[in-house]
Curated annotation (Swiss-Prot):
It is found in: Cytoplasm. GO terms for cellular component: cytoplasm. GO terms for biological process: rRNA processing. Keywords: Cytoplasm, Endonuclease, Hydrolase, Metal-binding, Nuclease, Ribosome biogenesis, rRNA processing, Zinc. Its main location: cytoplasm. Its cofactor is Zn(2+). This is Endoribonuclease YbeY. InterPro entries: MetalPrtase_cat_dom_sf_prd, YbeY, YbeY_CS. SUPFAM superfamilies: Metalloproteases ('zincins'), catalytic domain (SSF55486). PROSITE patterns: UPF0054 (PS01306). It holds the Pfam family YbeY. It comes from the Bacteria.
């Protein structure tokens, strides 16, 4: 098994109801070993204010979002296991899970899987890329024991 190193940062006022560090590690271990032998990821849990500010600064979107991914780009000659940072807004994740009628734990897992794939270079801007990324997300989520996160969209 490959090494996954997690730096979990709690930067939100309310810690009650958040997944445990072991959950985040398990979700990362469901993704990263498929692509790398060793990876280090920071997961920062934030409130809506920080998510909103980061989303505005880096994406020009004037609202908080569920997950932001910040890949680490080392010079080509430097080999480091640092993959990057995931910033996850717990209020947005909780609200989305409720609105989409998804189990909260499954939605948290999906945000970690989705964000990790962004760190690995996957994107969903073009339709073809989106289909590839969603297919990978579904496969990884099912291996982790969760339902297809896009099932409701596919059935609509």
């Amino acid at each position: 098994m490959s090494d996954v190193i997690l730096d979990l940062q709690l930067a939100c006022d309310e810690a009650r109801g958040l997944p445990a560090e072991a959950d985040f590690l398990r979700w990362l271990q469901g993704v990263l070993p498929l692509f790398r032998d060793c990876a280090e990821v920071t997961v920062r849990l934030v409130d809506e204010a920080e998510s909103h500010e980061l989303n505005m600064t880096y994406r020009g979107k004037d609202r908080p979002t569920n997950v932001l991914s910040f890949p680490f780009e080392a010079p080509p000659e430097v080999e480091l296991p640092l993959l990057g940072d995931l910033v996850i807004c717990h209020q947005v994740v909780e609200r989305e899970a409720q609105q989409q009628e998804k189990a909260l734990e499954a939605h948290w897992a999906h945000m970690v899987v989705h964000g990790s794939l962004h760190l690995l270079g996957y994107d969903h801007i073009q339709d073809e890329e989106a289909l590839e990324m969603e297919s990978l997300e579904t496969e990884i989520m099912q291996k982790l024991g969760y339902p297809d996160p896009y099932l409701a969209e596919k059935e609509a």
